[in-house]
From Swiss-Prot:
Species per Swiss-Prot/TrEMBL record: Shewanella sp. (strain MR-7)
Signal sequence extent: 1-22
Reported function: Chaperone involved in the correct folding and assembly of outer membrane proteins. Recognizes specific patterns of aromatic residues and the orientation of their side chains, which are found more frequently in integral outer membrane proteins. May act in both early periplasmic and late outer membrane-associated steps of protein maturation.
GO biological process: Gram-negative-bacterium-type cell outer membrane assembly; protein folding; protein stabilization
Pfam families, per database record: Rotamase, SurA_N
Protein origin, superkingdom: Bacteria
Broad class of enzyme this protein falls into: isomerase
Domain-related comment: The PPIase activity resides only in the second parvulin domain. The N-terminal region and the C-terminal tail are necessary and sufficient for the chaperone activity of SurA. The PPIase activity is dispensable for SurA to function as a chaperone. The N-terminal region and the C-terminal tail are also required for porin recognition.
UniProt-annotated location(s): Periplasm
Protein known as: Chaperone SurA
Domain (PpiC) ranges: 173-274, 283-383
GO molecular function, one term: peptidyl-prolyl cis-trans isomerase activity
Reactions catalysed, as given in the entry: [protein]-peptidylproline (omega=180) = [protein]-peptidylproline (omega=0)
Alphabetically ordered keywords of this record: Chaperone, Isomerase, Periplasm, Repeat, Rotamase, Signal
Length: 434
């Protein structure tokens, strides 16, 4: 089984906060102010050290320390802004939900939580730090989902159009790994600023065409969302990638460099890093039902979980039926009246904890109570089926592809807006001050 993305991210993120060995450390200082929050110099230094260590392990070259520092600061700024937003709306990942996530990760890794803790600590990492980094990762995922999802509308006409296109042309059976560099422009730029950005973009393009390493160039020059990852986006089908990418790469081949392409954000350079056939043309769908209880000032976390445990006993003993309890108690208005039925769907459309739980169940099996950002659930997996993503392309699949494309686009818009509205001040290190 592939390593869990949660585990990989958390192990990577934990390394950021690991102190170097016993050399004396200078007194820490405030490096960045972000609204009423701060970033410490030690946080920047530790993240730079981690990026360098990962680059050495991957035999990857990096740009200058100053360019790398700029990208690290930008990543920390965006992270802090999202966490501040989560705090403002009262989004907090409690210990019970965190424990559930850790149990799911351990299950994916085919080990117990104790074994996973031992593995993490054997690599010199603190399990407590792992928990807090994972809590932050879950928070970021949830605040993005909450804030971005409500900005997205997928119209019936868009779905019908994509279904028709797929039926006429067939599902594009190629996935592309895209490299992206954005040379940004200021808000409301004048002609001189546009010209300056255009010249920078063309200079970057010439360096790339002369053989300069793309990842190193992206870290040094890009203002795009994946800059610190060398500008590399994961494999995407053309129907789910951002519109800007999809419009220019159709028919392109591995190694092609395209651009600069002008948009409202600036000038884009795109490279086809790799292209491959779709890994599978079949998708797995599940039919499930659930009961949701939402903790509140009246219903505590422990009480909600205990009620679901009691429901579970009643269902297993035959004293009550799942659908009857769902109609009576579930607080999911979309499914309660249908006995908790969620219908056929890909597990990936649900929040991660729900999807992970469904993936761990056998048909007819009912889960133990588990926590998501929506509240406490029990769910029953009723059936699984595989459908052909090319021959049986349906409206649900079309909606998912359009939604993913729009989510990537709106996520960046949301981050840009938050950054533009924030008070941000970067304080230069003493050694850089004139």
């Amino acid at each position: 089984m592939k390593p869990s993305k949660h585990l990989i991210f958390a192990l990577f993120a934990l390394a950021i906060s690991q102190p170097t060995m016993a050399a004396p450390q200078p007194i820490d200082r405030v490096a960045v102010q972000i609204n009423d929050g701060i970033v410490l110099e030690s946080e920047i230094t530790n993240m730079i050290d981690t990026v360098k260590a990962n680059a050495r392990a991957a035999n990857q070259s990096l740009p200058s320390d100053s360019a790398l520092r700029t990208q690290v600061i930008e990543r920390l700024i965006l992270t802090r802004l999202q966490l501040q937003m989560a705090d403002r709306i009262g989004l907090h990942i409690g210990d019970l939900q965190l424990d559930q996530a850790i149990e799911n990760i351990a299950r994916e890794q085919k080990m117990t939580v104790a074994q996973m803790q031992q593995k993490i600590e054997s690599e010199g990492l603190s399990f407590g730090q792992y928990r807090e980094q994972l809590r932050e990762e879950i928070t970021l995922g949830e605040i993005q989902r909450i804030q971005v999802q409500r900005r997205i509308q997928v119209s019936p006409q868009e779905i019908t159009g994509l279904v028709k296109l797929i039926q006429e042309q067939g599902m594009k059976d190629v996935e592309y790994q895209i490299g992206h560099i954005l040379i940004d422009v200021p808000n409301n730029p004048n002609s001189e600023q546009l010209e300056a950005s255009s010249k920078r973009a063309n200079a970057v393009l010439e360096r790339l065409k002369s053989g300069e390493d793309f990842r190193r160039t992206a870290i040094a020059s890009s203002s795009g969302p994946k800059a610190l990852e060398g500008g590399i986006w994961d494999y995407m089908n053309i129907n789910e990638m951002p519109t800007l990418f999809a419009e220019v790469i159709n028919g392109a081949k591995k190694g092609d460099i395209i651009g600069p392409i002008k948009s409202g954000a600036g000038f884009h350079i795109i490279k086809i890093m790799d292209a491959r056939g779709l890994q599978t043309k079949e998708i797995e769908e599940v039919r499930a039902r659930h009961i949701l209880l939402k903790p509140s000032p009246i219903l505590s976390e422990d009480r909600a979980k205990a009620m679901l445990e009691q429901f579970l006993k009643q269902i297993r003993s035959g004293e009550a039926k799942f659908e009857d309890l769902a109609r009576q108690y579930s607080e999911d208005p979309g499914s309660a009246t249908k006995g908790g039925e969620l219908g056929w769907a890909e597990p990936s459309i649900y929040v991660p904890e729900f999807a992970q739980t469904l993936n761990s169940l056998s048909p007819d099996q009912i889960s133990e109570p588990f926590r998501t950002t929506h509240g406490w659930h029990i769910t029953q997996l009723e059936e699984r089926r595989k459908t052909d993503a090319t021959d049986q392309f349906n409206t649900n699949r079309a909606h998912q592809l359009i939604f993913r494309r729009k989510f990537n686009e709106e996520l960046q818009n949301w981050l840009d807006e938050m950054r533009a509205d924030a008070y941000i001040e970067v304080f230069q290190p003493e050694s850089n001050r004139g």
